[in-house]
Amino acid sequence: GRVMTAEDVKYVLDFACSGLSMNEMGYLLVDKIKGAREYNTKSVSKLLEGGVSGIKVVDENTVTIELVEPFVGFDRVLTHSGLAIFPKEAYEKYKEDAKKHPVGTGPFQMKLWKDNKIVLNRNSKYWKKDEFGNQLPFLEKISMTYAENKKSELLAFRNREIDLVLEIPVEEIEYILGSLEEAQEGKTVKHKIESKNSLSSTYFGFSHNSEPFNDVRVRKAFNFGIDRNLIVNEYLKGEGYPCANGFVPNIEGYTSERVKGFKLNVEQAKKLLAQAGYPDGKDFPELELYVNTQKGSSIFLLAQGVKEQLKKNLNVDVKLHLCSITERDDAIQRGEAKFWRGGWIADYPDPENFLTLFSSEHIGTNSSTMNQVKYNSAKYDGLLHASMKERNPKVRNDLFVQCDQLLIKDAAIMPLINDDFITMINSKVKNFETNSMEQLDFSFIFIKEPKN
């Protein structure tokens, strides 16, 4: 290995601004950094000499980045895990396979990536120490496996084959593992369950360019026609939080409670549906809800709850179409999907990262994530653009609130729940840390076997 320098930082940022097909980070930077858009269009086949004009190396420890216009959230953008620094040599050696051979400055090195298994070995040259001066990381090896379903994953946990389960379905825990009392009595694995508010939102998307959802009254009727509290409490067994306000969850410095969201109002929903030409759901077209999940999952239960609420309250029949993410996205691109499950987890902790999803500039880009609903509002775009330039935190948050409130006013989507990030850990695993963006830090973990 070698020492990381400012040249490496510039190389990675240039790469992230490029038009190369394997670059997935362009949307974060190309409209923010001076010269990045021009570089993006010219670097489709290869990286160009000199890189982005707005990114300059001052010395071996300093890089300057010139923005197109002020953006106070830019430091948060740079925390995105996809902008982790890697050396030029790694890309030149592995090319399109570089993602399978990660090279960086982290606490672990990839030893194996095969089929459903990844093995990480300790990086003995890692630069970081803990507060007591102990060299990190403490673990010698981490093995990760992918299970076919959560039930088999939980059984592996019970059989002590794995020590950590992510995104656990609450309703399965006691059935598979038994109660906490049984664990304390030694009848099953001693474990702890941690739940953290996640900076993620689940919503259902509407095709704004297709009937019946090109009519805002139908979109509003669907939003008023469901009881989000009931769905969370009855169908999801309390997992997650109903979107009582806007689309953006609470983020440090931003309070979503200022946005007035949709609440159950069956009378208003029926009135709007009738005004749109579908009294009591009569003549409403056949509707499929594309859901990228498997039967029995929490997302399936959420979709089932919405389906049953729409039938009960609006007499609208919805057929669940369970599929892969790729199938869902392809159906949206072809215009076949009119109604689908969508979601977003923050790339970085800033409201702008949620709200930029619905900028009209993404229409026509065929993006599989950005503005799939084709929401088009000049007013929204103006508010969003103003928020990105604004330096005063209070004024900036006021603009975010106005954006989020406009998404509700126009019923751009059906906001449903802000998610929990629930993990289950063997009690012998100490110092496990995660954050609201569901990122994991293994560098401080150590194992302390229980005394017999």
Label each residue range with its predicted role.
Residues V103, M144-L155, I168-E171, L320-D330:
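Short helix-initiation/N-cap motifs at beta->coil->alpha
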Residues E66-A84, P102-S152, I173-S200, K295:
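Aromatic-rich, solvent-exposed beta-strand/loop patch
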Residues V3-K10, D14-K88:
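Surface-exposed binding/hinge segments that line
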Residues I65, G133-T145, E161, K282-E288, ...:
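A local structural motif
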Residues G1-R2, D8, K151-V165, Y175, ...:
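Short helices/loops that flank or line small-molecule/ion binding pockets
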Residues V72, K117, A221-Y254, S298-K307, ...:
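Detector for C-terminal structural segments
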Residues N121-K129, K196-A221, G225, E234, ...:
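A bilobed periplasmic-binding-protein/Venus flytrap-type ligand-binding module shared by bacterial periplasmic
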Residues F108, P242-A276, T293-L302:
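Structural transition elements
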